[in-house]
Protein backbone atom coordinates (compact mmCIF):
# COMPACT_ATOMS: atom_id res chain seq x y z
CA UNK A 1 0.00 0.00 0.00
CA UNK A 2 1.20 3.53 -0.83
CA UNK A 3 2.54 5.55 2.13
CA UNK A 4 0.21 8.47 1.28
CA UNK A 5 -2.81 6.14 1.40
CA UNK A 6 -1.64 4.74 4.77
CA UNK A 7 -1.13 8.32 6.04
CA UNK A 8 -4.71 9.25 5.13
CA UNK A 9 -6.01 6.07 6.73
CA UNK A 10 -4.03 6.76 9.94
CA UNK A 11 -5.29 10.38 10.04
CA UNK A 12 -8.86 9.15 9.79
CA UNK A 13 -8.60 6.29 12.31
CA UNK A 14 -6.51 8.21 14.88
CA UNK A 15 -8.97 11.12 15.11
CA UNK A 16 -10.19 9.84 18.50
CA UNK A 17 -6.75 10.27 20.16
CA UNK A 18 -7.10 14.01 20.96
CA UNK A 19 -10.69 13.59 22.17
CA UNK A 20 -9.59 10.71 24.38
CA UNK A 21 -6.65 12.67 25.83
CA UNK A 22 -8.92 15.64 26.59
CA UNK A 23 -11.54 13.42 28.25
CA UNK A 24 -8.99 11.58 30.41
CA UNK A 25 -7.40 14.96 31.25
CA UNK A 26 -10.68 16.01 32.91
CA UNK A 27 -9.96 13.46 35.65
CA UNK A 28 -6.20 12.81 35.53
CA UNK A 29 -3.63 15.58 35.92
CA UNK A 30 -0.37 14.85 34.05
CA UNK A 31 0.86 11.23 33.67
CA UNK A 32 0.73 11.69 29.88
CA UNK A 33 3.57 9.19 29.29
CA UNK A 34 1.75 6.49 31.27
CA UNK A 35 -1.54 7.11 29.42
CA UNK A 36 0.23 6.99 26.05
CA UNK A 37 1.99 3.71 26.92
CA UNK A 38 -1.30 2.10 28.01
CA UNK A 39 -2.83 3.20 24.68
CA UNK A 40 0.13 1.64 22.85
CA UNK A 41 -0.63 -1.59 24.72
CA UNK A 42 -4.31 -1.37 23.70
CA UNK A 43 -3.46 -0.71 20.04
CA UNK A 44 -1.04 -3.63 19.82
CA UNK A 45 -2.53 -6.19 22.20
CA UNK A 46 0.55 -6.02 24.43
CA UNK A 47 0.26 -6.10 28.23
CA UNK A 48 1.76 -3.42 30.47
CA UNK A 49 3.63 -3.58 33.80
CA UNK A 50 3.48 -0.38 35.87
CA UNK A 51 6.04 0.20 38.60
CA UNK A 52 5.59 3.09 40.99
CA UNK A 53 4.96 4.05 44.60
CA UNK A 54 1.34 4.12 45.86
CA UNK A 55 -0.80 7.20 45.22
CA UNK A 56 0.34 8.05 41.68
CA UNK A 57 -3.14 7.51 40.12
CA UNK A 58 -2.33 4.19 38.44
CA UNK A 59 -5.72 2.64 39.26
CA UNK A 60 -7.64 5.86 38.56
CA UNK A 61 -5.93 6.28 35.18
CA UNK A 62 -6.89 2.78 34.02
CA UNK A 63 -10.47 3.19 35.34
CA UNK A 64 -10.81 6.57 33.58
CA UNK A 65 -9.47 5.13 30.30
CA UNK A 66 -11.99 2.29 30.48
CA UNK A 67 -14.82 4.82 30.97
CA UNK A 68 -13.60 6.96 28.06
CA UNK A 69 -13.34 3.89 25.81
CA UNK A 70 -16.66 2.38 26.98
CA UNK A 71 -14.88 -0.80 28.11
CA UNK A 72 -15.41 -3.19 31.00
CA UNK A 73 -12.88 -2.67 33.81
CA UNK A 74 -11.92 -5.02 36.65
CA UNK A 75 -9.38 -4.54 39.41
CA UNK A 76 -7.87 -7.55 41.18
CA UNK A 77 -5.99 -6.89 44.43
CA UNK A 78 -3.28 -9.53 44.66
CA UNK A 79 -2.70 -10.93 48.16
CA UNK A 80 -0.77 -13.96 49.52
CA UNK A 81 -4.00 -15.94 50.07
CA UNK A 82 -5.40 -15.38 46.55
CA UNK A 83 -6.23 -18.53 44.54
CA UNK A 84 -6.23 -19.04 40.74
CA UNK A 85 -10.02 -19.59 40.89
CA UNK A 86 -10.38 -16.07 42.37
CA UNK A 87 -9.08 -14.73 39.05
CA UNK A 88 -10.34 -17.03 36.31
CA UNK A 89 -13.52 -18.31 37.99
CA UNK A 90 -14.87 -21.68 39.05
CA UNK A 91 -17.80 -24.07 38.55
CA UNK A 92 -20.70 -24.06 40.99
CA UNK A 93 -23.48 -26.60 41.39
CA UNK A 94 -26.97 -25.46 40.38
CA UNK A 95 -29.39 -27.51 42.49
CA UNK A 96 -32.45 -26.44 40.50
CA UNK A 97 -31.00 -27.77 37.25
CA UNK A 98 -28.81 -30.48 38.84
CA UNK A 99 -25.75 -29.37 36.87
CA UNK A 100 -22.47 -27.53 37.29
CA UNK A 101 -22.38 -24.06 35.76
CA UNK A 102 -19.34 -21.81 35.24
CA UNK A 103 -18.98 -18.67 37.36
CA UNK A 104 -16.63 -16.39 35.48
CA UNK A 105 -13.96 -14.50 37.41
CA UNK A 106 -12.79 -10.86 37.13
CA UNK A 107 -10.38 -11.76 34.29
CA UNK A 108 -13.40 -11.51 31.95
CA UNK A 109 -13.05 -7.79 31.24
CA UNK A 110 -11.47 -5.58 28.58
CA UNK A 111 -9.09 -3.80 30.95
CA UNK A 112 -7.84 -5.81 33.92
CA UNK A 113 -5.71 -4.14 36.60
CA UNK A 114 -3.65 -6.69 38.55
CA UNK A 115 -2.75 -4.57 41.57
CA UNK A 116 0.53 -5.50 43.32
CA UNK A 117 1.02 -8.64 41.24
CA UNK A 118 4.15 -9.56 43.22
CA UNK A 119 2.11 -10.06 46.43
CA UNK A 120 0.51 -13.31 45.21
CA UNK A 121 2.23 -16.72 44.99
CA UNK A 122 3.59 -18.14 41.73
CA UNK A 123 0.57 -20.36 40.92
CA UNK A 124 -1.71 -17.29 40.92
CA UNK A 125 0.73 -15.25 38.84
CA UNK A 126 1.02 -18.10 36.32
CA UNK A 127 -2.80 -18.37 36.06
CA UNK A 128 -2.96 -14.69 35.11
CA UNK A 129 0.01 -14.90 32.75
CA UNK A 130 -1.45 -17.95 31.02
CA UNK A 131 -4.66 -15.99 30.40
CA UNK A 132 -2.55 -13.10 29.05
CA UNK A 133 -0.72 -15.40 26.63
CA UNK A 134 -3.58 -17.64 25.47
CA UNK A 135 -6.39 -15.04 25.71
CA UNK A 136 -8.59 -17.84 26.97
CA UNK A 137 -9.15 -19.65 30.27
CA UNK A 138 -10.40 -23.10 31.20
CA UNK A 139 -13.07 -23.35 33.89
CA UNK A 140 -13.85 -26.97 34.74
CA UNK A 141 -13.58 -28.75 31.40
CA UNK A 142 -14.76 -25.85 29.22
CA UNK A 143 -12.51 -23.29 27.55
CA UNK A 144 -13.79 -19.71 27.43
CA UNK A 145 -12.43 -16.99 25.15
CA UNK A 146 -11.62 -13.68 26.85
CA UNK A 147 -13.29 -10.51 25.50
CA UNK A 148 -11.58 -8.38 22.86
CA UNK A 149 -9.84 -6.04 23.26
CA UNK A 150 -8.17 -7.59 26.31
CA UNK A 151 -5.36 -5.84 28.16
CA UNK A 152 -3.74 -6.62 31.50
CA UNK A 153 -2.00 -3.87 33.42
CA UNK A 154 -0.09 -5.17 36.42
CA UNK A 155 1.37 -2.92 39.11
CA UNK A 156 4.19 -3.50 41.54
CA UNK A 157 5.53 -1.35 44.34
CA UNK A 158 9.33 -0.81 44.09
CA UNK A 159 9.70 0.00 47.81
CA UNK A 160 8.13 -2.77 49.92
CA UNK A 161 9.74 -6.05 48.92
CA UNK A 162 9.07 -7.94 52.17
CA UNK A 163 6.63 -10.80 51.71
CA UNK A 164 6.55 -10.46 47.94
CA UNK A 165 7.02 -13.03 45.19
CA UNK A 166 9.21 -11.46 42.51
CA UNK A 167 8.09 -12.12 38.94
CA UNK A 168 10.54 -14.48 37.20
CA UNK A 169 12.29 -13.18 34.06
CA UNK A 170 10.30 -15.58 31.85
CA UNK A 171 7.05 -14.04 33.09
CA UNK A 172 8.33 -10.46 32.97
CA UNK A 173 9.17 -11.08 29.30
CA UNK A 174 5.46 -11.51 28.52
CA UNK A 175 4.80 -7.86 29.31
CA UNK A 176 5.26 -5.70 26.25
CA UNK A 177 6.13 -2.57 28.25
CA UNK A 178 7.42 -1.87 31.73
CA UNK A 179 6.67 1.69 32.76
CA UNK A 180 8.25 3.53 35.67
CA UNK A 181 5.50 5.83 36.95
CA UNK A 182 7.03 9.03 38.30
CA UNK A 183 5.90 11.75 40.69
CA UNK A 184 3.90 14.72 39.33
CA UNK A 185 5.60 18.10 38.83
CA UNK A 186 5.06 20.90 41.37
CA UNK A 187 2.42 22.54 39.12
CA UNK A 188 0.64 19.22 38.54
CA UNK A 189 0.59 18.46 42.26
CA UNK A 190 -1.02 21.84 42.97
CA UNK A 191 -3.68 21.11 40.32
CA UNK A 192 -4.27 17.62 41.80
CA UNK A 193 -4.66 19.05 45.31
CA UNK A 194 -7.10 21.75 44.16
CA UNK A 195 -9.14 19.31 42.08
CA UNK A 196 -9.39 16.60 44.77
CA UNK A 197 -10.37 19.03 47.54
CA UNK A 198 -12.91 21.05 45.55
CA UNK A 199 -15.74 18.60 46.28
CA UNK A 200 -16.53 18.21 42.57
CA UNK A 201 -16.92 14.64 41.32
CA UNK A 202 -15.59 14.62 37.75
CA UNK A 203 -15.79 11.50 35.60
CA UNK A 204 -14.92 10.73 31.99
CA UNK A 205 -17.58 10.15 29.34
CA UNK A 206 -17.25 7.67 26.48
CA UNK A 207 -15.53 9.24 23.44
CA UNK A 208 -14.54 6.01 21.65
CA UNK A 209 -15.75 2.41 21.51
CA UNK A 210 -14.08 -1.02 21.62
CA UNK A 211 -15.02 -1.34 17.93
CA UNK A 212 -13.01 1.81 17.09
CA UNK A 213 -10.02 0.40 18.99
CA UNK A 214 -10.34 -2.87 17.04
CA UNK A 215 -10.38 -0.91 13.74
CA UNK A 216 -7.41 1.20 14.89
CA UNK A 217 -5.48 -2.00 15.69
CA UNK A 218 -5.80 -3.22 12.10
CA UNK A 219 -4.55 0.17 10.83
CA UNK A 220 -1.57 0.13 13.24
CA UNK A 221 -0.43 -3.13 11.62
CA UNK A 222 -0.39 -1.36 8.24
CA UNK A 223 1.82 1.57 9.38
CA UNK A 224 4.82 1.62 7.02
CA UNK A 225 8.20 0.56 8.37
CA UNK A 226 11.25 0.83 6.11
CA UNK A 227 13.76 -2.03 5.82
CA UNK A 228 16.44 0.18 7.42
CA UNK A 229 14.22 0.76 10.48
CA UNK A 230 13.65 -3.01 10.79
CA UNK A 231 17.42 -3.58 10.66
CA UNK A 232 17.87 -0.84 13.28
CA UNK A 233 15.50 -2.67 15.67
CA UNK A 234 17.39 -5.95 15.20
CA UNK A 235 20.74 -4.15 15.73
CA UNK A 236 19.52 -2.65 19.03
CA UNK A 237 18.27 -6.00 20.34
CA UNK A 238 21.38 -7.84 19.09
CA UNK A 239 23.57 -5.25 20.88
CA UNK A 240 22.00 -6.30 24.22
CA UNK A 241 23.32 -9.84 23.60
CA UNK A 242 26.63 -9.09 21.85
CA UNK A 243 27.73 -5.61 23.00
CA UNK A 244 31.34 -6.24 21.83
CA UNK A 245 30.17 -6.69 18.23
CA UNK A 246 28.80 -3.14 18.35
CA UNK A 247 31.90 -1.55 19.88
CA UNK A 248 30.46 -1.62 23.40
CA UNK A 249 32.90 -4.01 25.08
CA UNK A 250 32.70 -2.05 28.35
CA UNK A 251 29.07 -3.22 28.76
CA UNK A 252 29.94 -6.94 28.52
CA UNK A 253 30.69 -7.16 32.26
CA UNK A 254 27.35 -5.55 33.12
CA UNK A 255 24.93 -7.57 30.94
CA UNK A 256 24.19 -11.10 32.14
CA UNK A 257 21.43 -11.87 29.61
CA UNK A 258 20.31 -9.84 26.61
CA UNK A 259 16.77 -9.33 25.33
CA UNK A 260 14.80 -12.20 23.76
CA UNK A 261 13.29 -12.12 20.22
CA UNK A 262 10.08 -10.87 21.86
CA UNK A 263 11.92 -7.54 22.25
CA UNK A 264 12.28 -7.18 18.44
CA UNK A 265 8.61 -8.05 17.89
CA UNK A 266 7.40 -5.63 20.58
CA UNK A 267 9.73 -2.81 19.46
CA UNK A 268 8.29 -3.16 15.96
CA UNK A 269 4.66 -3.14 17.14
CA UNK A 270 5.09 -0.39 19.76
CA UNK A 271 6.91 1.89 17.28
CA UNK A 272 4.03 1.55 14.80
CA UNK A 273 1.50 2.41 17.54
CA UNK A 274 3.69 5.36 18.65
CA UNK A 275 3.64 6.71 15.06
CA UNK A 276 -0.15 6.11 14.86
CA UNK A 277 -0.75 8.19 18.01
CA UNK A 278 1.08 11.04 16.25
CA UNK A 279 -1.12 10.63 13.15
CA UNK A 280 1.78 9.32 11.05
CA UNK A 281 1.56 6.42 8.63
CA UNK A 282 5.28 5.64 8.81
CA UNK A 283 7.84 4.85 11.53
CA UNK A 284 10.97 6.95 12.18
CA UNK A 285 14.04 6.12 14.36
CA UNK A 286 12.62 8.59 16.92
CA UNK A 287 9.65 6.26 17.46
CA UNK A 288 12.05 3.41 18.28
CA UNK A 289 14.02 5.60 20.70
CA UNK A 290 10.87 6.94 22.37
CA UNK A 291 9.57 3.50 23.39
CA UNK A 292 12.89 1.59 23.45
CA UNK A 293 13.58 1.89 27.18
CA UNK A 294 10.04 0.80 28.15
CA UNK A 295 10.28 -2.28 25.89
CA UNK A 296 13.80 -3.28 26.95
CA UNK A 297 14.23 -2.30 30.64
CA UNK A 298 12.79 -5.57 32.02
CA UNK A 299 14.43 -7.73 29.35
CA UNK A 300 18.08 -6.77 29.87
CA UNK A 301 19.27 -8.73 32.92
CA UNK A 302 22.28 -7.17 34.65
CA UNK A 303 25.17 -8.83 36.50
CA UNK A 304 25.95 -8.43 40.21
CA UNK A 305 28.86 -6.24 39.12
CA UNK A 306 26.45 -3.78 37.52
CA UNK A 307 24.33 -3.71 40.68
CA UNK A 308 27.46 -3.15 42.81
CA UNK A 309 28.38 -0.15 40.65
CA UNK A 310 24.75 1.07 40.76
CA UNK A 311 24.36 0.77 36.99
CA UNK A 312 20.71 0.35 35.96
CA UNK A 313 19.25 -1.30 32.86
CA UNK A 314 18.14 2.18 31.69
CA UNK A 315 21.78 3.35 31.74
CA UNK A 316 22.85 0.34 29.65
CA UNK A 317 19.99 0.77 27.15
CA UNK A 318 20.73 4.50 26.71
CA UNK A 319 24.37 3.65 25.91
CA UNK A 320 23.19 1.13 23.31
CA UNK A 321 20.98 3.74 21.64
CA UNK A 322 23.88 6.24 21.67
CA UNK A 323 26.28 3.82 19.94
CA UNK A 324 24.14 1.79 17.52
CA UNK A 325 24.11 3.57 14.16
CA UNK A 326 20.82 5.32 13.34
CA UNK A 327 19.56 4.79 9.75
Each language-model region and where it sits:
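C-terminal engagement/docking regions of AAA+ P-loop ATPases
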Residues: 1-10, 242-327
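Walker B catalytic acidic pair
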Residues: 52, 115-116, 127
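Pre-Walker A (pre-P-loop) alpha-helix and adjacent loop at the N terminus of AAA/AAA+ ATPase modules
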Residues: 9-56
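Walker A/P-loop
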Residues: 42-79
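Canonical AAA+ ATPase core
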Residues: 94-99, 116, 120-124, 132-223, ...
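Conserved C-terminal "switch" segment of AAA+ ATPases
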Residues: 6-14, 27, 178-250, 277-281, ...
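P-loop (Walker A) phosphate-binding loop of NTP-binding proteins
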Residues: 53, 87, 155
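Conserved alpha-helical scaffold flanking the Walker A/P-loop in AAA+ ATPase domains
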Residues: 37-40, 93-113
Amino acid sequence: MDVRVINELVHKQSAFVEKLSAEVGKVIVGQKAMIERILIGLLTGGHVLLEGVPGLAKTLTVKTLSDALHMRFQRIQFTPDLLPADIVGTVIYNQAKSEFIPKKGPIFANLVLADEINRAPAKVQSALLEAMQERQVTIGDTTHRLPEPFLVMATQNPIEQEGTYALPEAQLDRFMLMIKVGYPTREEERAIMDRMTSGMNVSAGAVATPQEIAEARSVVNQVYMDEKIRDYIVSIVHATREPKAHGLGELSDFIQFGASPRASIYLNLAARAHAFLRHRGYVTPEDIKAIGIDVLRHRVILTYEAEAEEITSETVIRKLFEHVEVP
